[in-house]
């Protein structure tokens, strides 16, 4: 069933009524509480304000952003076209590369310098990092840097030249780059692939996952300008979009898979392999494209020239390119239905691949293609159609853990069935956030990890019918919250006091927050706003304010109180039924807000005749600091039980005080 199917709680029936009784002042009656539909708040109460940066306000004034969440009429972002060539020597573990990057200045600013990311420099001896980088192999060895046709040298003096500081290279241009102009940059470099244990990739025997392997233009955006934060290992990335043409040279017999579409299959794949791929493109099941027998016979690739093959790939509108290669890989393939991805009114499909070593069958990798197919099809229905030509899961070094790249995911280690599906669907969920919706992962990890963790829960519930991954997220968040060890979500990914606080703030709490927001708005409105956010910011760079404004624009509600509570503070939610007592022909139900987090109170009153009444007290009753509210409900038919938040939508820190009788 489509998880977006709208459901609504019943409105307040005439049989029951709610009256607010002041918690102080000698029992004097307060104005009646409006029995609101789920998620509504009084427009008369503004609520808690959300801090807005001066930079965002400036962007609004300049017309690049809006207060409705729609990109502004003057929105712009930079672009780059990459032509890259690389050869990997599997014996020496060395990669030799060269390339030309054409950078397009779509900003209104004249640029006198540009910044380039050399992410592999995290492996240089003495490099700065805040996570375990056990291998100091070497950084990027640059042999050529040219800009606008001029060879550049390392220099800290003014004038044309470049300098490297950790993972950031600054290039001072020979000529200013005006708005609407472009500049070509030429690079040649060498680097060594780190062994297993390096974060997010590396090599493990005859298996390589190659990431962050080329000079990449840093982001220059309309809010913060150049993004020059160092890559320290914990906080992830903020990458611009572009087109890539990539040529990769490997020994014949080594399979290669990469971001992008393979342009020369007849030159690198055997006829048998190509025929099986063609079958997989329309098969209902999984096709074993390359088997162990094919490996033994050496029939997976062509013979090549001088024992080498060059694989050519083209990737459009992506923020990065990664690739994997091995002399041991098996290859499974199928296809996935993604809906109308190109807007021509007809359904589309995408290729699904799994590359893995034979020994990984014990980790259920022979099911990987099936898991990937379900994930792509589910997210294409739940969010937006998947637009890329393939989705490929790669068995990589153990230190990959689970890591996302455009059209690819690297998964390392041993897994059971549940674990392999979970990591697969999570990393595939990242194809939407941040691959298609390109947020700043460094500053706002929750915008990609938290949203993807939430999406993972929806996918797992669909695949493992009845599995409640949302409860796992909620429990992981509450376990830390109960200790007082959590920190706010609006924090740079490199500035958390511990990995546990980073993990909760980036994954579990924001995923739990989205479940709560769905409870506030109702599933129909929530899903409409969620997909609208993705649609508006497809291939763009949203900030948190753009997400906030989109939800408020679609729902028609001021949600500043919600964002402030769950993103900027570490307030805890503790809603309790304090007392239930007779009041003539009515019952007075005293609700207490024992925590600092203001949220609506969703109350289920179950009567002995089987009727269940859903009542809602809006969140704004708590905005002024009030801690207690008395709800007066009809006494007959007799009340069997009363429960706060019966659907478990809100992360309350103490469930034991939410039901009557206890």
Locate the predicted segments by residue.
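Beta-strand-rich binding/interaction modules
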Residues: 257-258, 270, 324, 580-646
């Amino acid at each position: 069933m489509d998880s977006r199917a709208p459901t609504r709680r019943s409105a307040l029936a005439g049989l029951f009524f709610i009256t607010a009784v002041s918690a102080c002042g000698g029992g004097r009656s307060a104005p009646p509480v409006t029995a609101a539909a789920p998620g509504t708040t009084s427009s008369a109460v503004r609520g808690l304000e959300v801090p807005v940066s001066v930079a965002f306000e400036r962007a609004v004034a300049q017309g690049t952003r809006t207060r409705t969440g729609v990109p502004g009429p003057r929105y712009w972002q930079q672009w780059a076209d990459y032509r890259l060539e690389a050869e990997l020597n599997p014996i020496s573990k060395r990669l030799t590369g060269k390339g030309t990057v054409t950078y397009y200045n779509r900003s209104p600013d004249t640029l006198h310098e540009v910044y380039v990311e050399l992410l592999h420099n995290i492996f240089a001896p003495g490099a700065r990092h805040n996570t375990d980088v056990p291998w100091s192999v070497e950084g990027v060895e640059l042999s050529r840097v040219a800009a606008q046709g001029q060879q550049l040298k390392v220099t800290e003096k003014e004038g044309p030249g470049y300098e490297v500081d950790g993972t950031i290279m600054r290039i001072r241009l020979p000529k200013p780059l005006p708005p609407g102009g472009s500049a070509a940059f030429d690079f040649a470099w060498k680097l060594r692939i780190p062994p297993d244990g390096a974060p997010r990739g590396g090599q493990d025997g005859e298996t390589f996952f190659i990431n962050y392997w080329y000079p990449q233009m840093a982001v220059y955006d309309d809010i913060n300008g150049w993004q020059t934060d160092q890559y320290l290992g914990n906080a992830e990335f903020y990458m611009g979009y572009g087109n890539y043409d990539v040529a990769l040279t490997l020994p014949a017999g080594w399979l290669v898979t990469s971001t992008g579409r393979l342009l020369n299959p007849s030159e690198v794949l055997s006829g048998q392999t190509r025929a099986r791929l063609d079958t997989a493109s329309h098969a209902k099941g999984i096709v074993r494209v390359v088997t162990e027998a094919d490996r033994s016979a050496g029939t997976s690739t062509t013979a090549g020239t001088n024992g080498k093959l060059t694989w050519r790939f083209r990737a459009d509108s992506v923020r990065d390119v990664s690739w994997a290669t091995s002399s041991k890989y098996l290859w499974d393939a199928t296809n996935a239905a993604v809906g109308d991805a190109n807007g021509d009114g007809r359904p589309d499909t995408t290729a699904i691949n799994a590359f893995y070593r034979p020994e990984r069958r014990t980790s259920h990798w022979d099911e990987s293609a099936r898991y990937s197919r379900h994930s792509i099809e589910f997210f294409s229905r739940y969010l937006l159609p998947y637009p890329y030509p393939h989705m490929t899961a790669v068995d990589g070094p153990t230190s990959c853990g689970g890591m996302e790249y455009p059209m690819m995911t690297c998964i390392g280690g041993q897994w059971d069935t549940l674990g392999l599906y979970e990591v697969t669907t999570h990393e595939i969920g990242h194809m939407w956030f941040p691959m298609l919706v390109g947020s700043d992962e460094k500053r706002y990890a929750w915008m990609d990890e938290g949203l993807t963790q939430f999406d993972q829960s929806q996918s797992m519930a669909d695949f493992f019918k009845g599995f409640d991954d949302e409860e796992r997220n909620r429990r992981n968040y509450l376990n830390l919250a109960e200790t007082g060890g959590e920190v706010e979500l609006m924090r740079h990914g490199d500035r958390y006091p511990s990995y546990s606080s980073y993990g909760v703030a980036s994954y579990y709490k924001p995923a739990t927050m989205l479940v709560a927001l769905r409870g506030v708005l109702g599933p129909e409105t929530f899903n409409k706003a969620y997909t609208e956010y993705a649609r508006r910011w497809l291939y763009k760079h949203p900030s948190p304010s753009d997400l906030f404004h989109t939800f408020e624009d679609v729902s028609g509600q001021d949600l500043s109180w919600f964002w402030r509570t769950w993103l900027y503070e570490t307030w805890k939610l503790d809603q309790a039924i304090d007392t239930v007592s007779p009041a003539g022909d009515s019952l007075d139900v005293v609700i207490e807000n024992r925590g600092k987090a203001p949220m609506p109170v969703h109350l289920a009153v179950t009567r002995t005749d089987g009727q269940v009444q859903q009542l809602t007290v809006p969140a704004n009753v708590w905005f002024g600091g009030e801690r207690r509210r008395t709800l007066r409900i009809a006494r007959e038919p007799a009340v069997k039980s009363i429960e706060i938040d019966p659907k478990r939508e809100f992360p309350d820190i103490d469930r034991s005080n939410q039901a009557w009788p206890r």
